[in-house]
Curated annotation (Swiss-Prot):
Family: Belongs to the DNA mismatch repair MutS family.
Annotated InterPro entries: DNA_mismatch_repair_MutS, DNA_mismatch_repair_MutS-lik_N, DNA_mismatch_repair_MutS/MSH, DNA_mismatch_repair_MutS_C, DNA_mismatch_repair_MutS_clamp, DNA_mismatch_repair_MutS_core, DNA_mismatch_repair_MutS_N, DNA_mismatch_repair_MutS_sf
Residues where ATP binds: 622-629
Keywords per UniProt: ATP-binding, DNA damage, DNA repair, DNA-binding, Nucleotide-binding
Protein's organism: Coxiella burnetii (strain Dugway 5J108-111)
Protein name per Swiss-Prot or TrEMBL: DNA mismatch repair protein MutS
Record's function text: This protein is involved in the repair of mismatches in DNA. It is possible that it carries out the mismatch recognition step. This protein has a weak ATPase activity.
Gene: mutS
Stretches that traverse the bilayer: none
Length: 859
């Protein structure tokens, strides 16, 4: 049998297909780019191209179903009871899915069972708990571009957080994409920019990016006449993006969105700018392999609630510049740290659950019974949290948290009365509403569960009333409930008995009372289920009325959770409160790398960092593995921790205003873009030199190493000089070009430091201690020996090093700056006569050897 290889959904004429396939194809035509899960009995089936794609992605069997239009139909399916597992996998792969349910009764349908689309699941609009990562915001992002400006709108539908901003460069745009890491990204079909860092990218038609339409949609959503009250009217591109976003969410949700009741502008100047490279290099949310272990978030996240965990990551991803707000956070941490108040608060917070997403599902009317059970538990904890905060000396931050927690006594009592202690997962089969909550429901349940006792009582009652001792009450599927009397006593049957069936030895009757009971019992289960669903919807209505205070409560709990966690981390990890200053300074006493210290078995060597107006750049030298990169990263991480309001891994820290953190650490080929290691390095360096300011912290490691010695040295020298003299940024500049240490003699704001090491019996011992002044040796052979280079190779290298060091030695230990880049005009022998064999480093010797070879070749 030949499988149809092309989906017929693009054809207008479906007449050649079976009625059921015509129904499917009409639905599929409305959603050509989405996978359609089409309910058929106990399975969701996929057909044609959808089936082939799903079979590959989900590793399920591709088969065929009969014929339609003369061809076998490719088909794949999944059981309805396991569909959530398959949906989770598809969403994580960036796919979008349409769920098409049977809404008709197969027993009464004359043609195909009626079906309709009940859910559209896309990566950025999913709200089901099973499909979400509880530690990560699930963000939908829209970008609207006009020339070199970009409007950005983001929405986390699982919280209602709706944000917009405008950006004026592609570098800043990509930095935002890296920060937000949207689950789904929408751009116009006319966009020229191609961001590649989102899990799922979709192009939307240009007409969805209409400013006037956006204004109308947003005003309708927020039930306002204008957007003036939101303070966003100066962001027309972002408003247009928000309009497209709202259209898309309305399209996917097919329901009201009452939890989206506000929109906020993100001001770029409020936060430290951290570009994509810096986020990766500092391993803020994930390590360099893309995993969370050994990242800053991994170290800090001891939160008690999922929403606290997500908020902590938002804080890490967006450090603030407002020192007043940061001081408030720090003061709150100090209060929670005192007498270890954080411990008792944590014990209560861990019973809250994911209140933020539960409230969103209530708003979307997709909350499940266990969501309401968890909400009830959370509301029950609030009075204790209130009391715990009341007992503390509250600063402004903690007072706001307490005020926004709220007390929901009525809702708590309602949920206590309405929902059983341990409800089932879904409302579908009932058993959710507690006995005693609703009298009609109780009556229906009693009829269903206690019908046998009713029949016993009725039989006894009728025997006594009629004096017929052979009277029985029975039931069969055909005739239902009946009263049975023997033929011998049938003449004694009361007149109100209505004959229903005559058998050989008995007569069977029905009475009005029994008929009423029969109707009630036979329909009681379905009626009880319908009543239960009705009551459940009424509960959701009641909860939706309290949506805004519940959202405020969830936000307050998340903030309390993060501050509480920072207090616990400060106590456990020996962090101390930094001091904020209004003048330029980064002064860290006994600073430590928080993650390296945590994973090491040996004690970590703390080091000082001192940068100020007269000391803006440190040229850092020392051996590989000596700790240069760790030292630079720890300085950046301590700064970043302070700017999220955390305590820091240092004995003391003073920090002035910081606007940006840049890193140029490590590099690799970008084969996808056709860029070499050196090109990647120079692109990152260029971004720093174009964007750093006097208030920036810049980390640069081994600039220039990806090209020839003299090209690299020249570039490193020029970049360091530019940073120190033109930008005047705070900079840590690690290098193996010893010649760069000469900068300190000509530029007062440049200082030399090195990471110390000692040599013992041809082995190197790294002290990891920062010392003033330049390093006097690179220890390259010793590091190579530690790396496992064969001993014979090391011995050969040592012999070669001695040969290079002996004949070629410079006159001075540190050549003057103006001699570094002069062209060599003397012949080889003249140059040799000018050299002195005592003080050159191995690298200097090798460089001069290459120089002499070049001179010789020119002769």
């Amino acid at each position: 049998m030949e499988l149809q290889t092309k989906s017929p959904t693009t054809q207008n004429d479906f007449s050649q297909h079976t009625p059921m396939m015509r129904q499917y194809l009409r639905i599929k035509a409305e959603y050509p780019d989405l996978l359609v899960f089409y309910r058929m009995g106990d399975f969701y089936e996929l057909f044609y191209d959808d089936a082939k794609k799903a079979a590959k992605l989900l590793n399920i069997t591709l088969t065929a179903r009969g014929q339609s239009a003369g061809h076998a139909i490719p088909m794949a399916g999944v059981p309805y009871h396991a569909v959530e597992n398959y949906l989770t996998k598809l969403v994580r792969l960036g796919e979008s899915v349409v769920i098409c349910e049977q809404i008709g009764d197969p027993a009464t349908s004359k043609g195909p069972v009626a079906r309709e689309v009940t859910r559209i699941i896309t990566p950025g609009t999913v709200s089901d708990e099973a499909l979400l990562d509880e530690h990560r915001d699930n963000t939908l992002m829209v970008i609207h571009q006009e020339k070199d400006r970009f409007g950005i709108a983001t929405l986390d539908i699982t919280s209602g957080r709706f944000l917009i901003q405008e950006i004026i460069s592609e570098n800043a745009l990509f930095a935002e994409i890296e920060r937000i890491r949207p689950a789904e990204l929408l751009i116009s079909e006319e966009n020229s920019v191609h961001p590649l860092k989102a899990d799922s990218i979709k192009r939307r038609p240009p007409w969805e990016f209409d400013h006037a339409t956006a204004l109308t949609l947003l005003c309708q959503q927020f039930q306002t006449k204008s957007l003036d009250g939101f303070g966003i009217t100066h962001l027309p591109l972002a408003i247009t993006a928000a309009g497209c976003l709202l259209q898309y969410v309305n399209y996917t949700q097919k329901s009201a969105l009452p939890h989206i009741h506000s929109i906020q502008a993100e001001q770029n100047e409020e936060a430290l700018f951290i570009d994509a490279n810096t986020r990766r290099n500092l391993e803020l949310i994930t390590n360099l392999q893309g995993e969370e272990v050994h990242s800053l978030a991994w170290l800090l996240d001891h939160t008690a609630t999922p929403m606290g965990s997500r908020l902590l990551r938002r804080w890490i991803n967006r450090p603030l510049r407002d020192q007043i707000l940061l001081q408030q956070r720090q003061n709150a941490v100090s209060t929670l740290l005192e007498k270890r108040n954080y411990s008792e608060i944590y014990e209560n917070l861990r019973h809250i659950g994911d209140l933020e997403r539960i409230v969103a599902r209530i708003a979307l009317r997709s909350a499940r019974p266990r969501d309401l059970m968890q909400l009830r538990q959370a509301l029950g904890v609030l009075p204790t949290l209130h009391q715990q905060l009341t007992n503390l000396p509250l600063n402004k931050q903690l007072q706001e948290i307490k005020n926004n927690l709220g007390l929901f006594d009525e809702l708590f009592r309602l949920l206590q009365k309405a929902i059983i202690e341990n409800p089932p997962i879904v409302i579908r089969d009932g058993g959710v509403i507690a006995d005693g909550y609703d009298a009609p429901l109780d009556e229906l349940r009693n009829m269903s569960t206690n019908s046998h006792q009713f029949l016993i009582d009725l039989e006894q009652q009728e025997r006594e009333r009629t004096k017929i001792n052979t009277l029985k009450v029975g039931y069969n599927r055909i005739h239902g409930y009946y009263i049975e009397i023997s033929r011998a006593q049938a003449k004694q049957a009361p007149t109100e008995y209505i004959r229903r069936q005559t058998l050989k030895n008995v007569e069977r009757y029905i009475t009005p009372e029994l008929k009423i009971f029969e109707d009630k019992v036979l329909s009681s289960r379905s009626r009880a289920l319908a009543r239960e669903k009705e009551l459940y919807e009424q509960l959701l209505d009641t909860l939706i009325e309290k949506l805004i205070p519940l959202q405020q409560c969830a936000s307050a709990i998340a903030n309390l959770d993060v501050l509480n966690t920072l207090a616990e981390r400060a106590d456990t990890l020996n962090f101390n409160a930094p001091q904020f200053c209004d003048y330029p300074i980064i002064k860290i006493e006994a600073g430590r790398h928080p993650i390296v210290e945590n994973v090491m078995t040996d004690p970590f060597m703390p080091n000082d960092t001192h940068l100020d107006e007269k000391r803006r750049m440190l040229i850092i030298t020392g051996p590989n593995m000596g700790g240069k990169s760790t030292y630079m990263r720890q300085t950046a991480l301590i700064t970043l921790l302070a700017y999220i309001g955390s305590f820091v891994p240092a004995k003391n820290a003073q920090l002035g205003p910081i606007d940006r953190i840049f890193t140029r650490i490590g590099a690799a080929d970008d084969l996808a873009s056709g860029r070499s290691t050196f090109m990647v390095e120079m692109t990152e360096t260029a971004a720093i030199l174009h964007n750093a300011t006097e208030e920036s912290l810049v980390l640069m490691d081994e600039v220039g190493r990806g090209t020839s010695t003299f090209d690299g040295l020249s570039l490193a020298y020029a970049c360091a000089s530019y940073l120190a003299t033109k930008l005047k940024a705070f900079a840590l500049f690690a290098t193996h070009y010893f010649e760069l240490t000469a900068l300190a003699s000509t530029l007062p704001a440049v200082k030399n430091v090195h990471l110390d090491a000692v040599e013992h019996e041809e082995k190197i011992i790294f002290l990891h201690a920062l010392r003033e002044g330049p390093a006097n040796k690179s220890y390259g052979l010793q590091v190579a020996q530690l790396a496992g280079i064969p001993r014979s190779v090391i011995q050969h290298a040592r012999q070669k090093l001695e040969e290079l060091e002996n004949p070629v030695i410079s006159e001075t230990q540190q050549p003057q700056q103006n001699e570094l880049f002069l062209p060599i005009e003397n012949p080889v022998l003249t140059q040799l006569d000018k050299l002195n064999p005592d003080n050159l480093t191995p690298k200097q010797a090798l460089d001069i050897l290459y120089q002499l070879i070049q001179l010789r070749q020119q002769k």
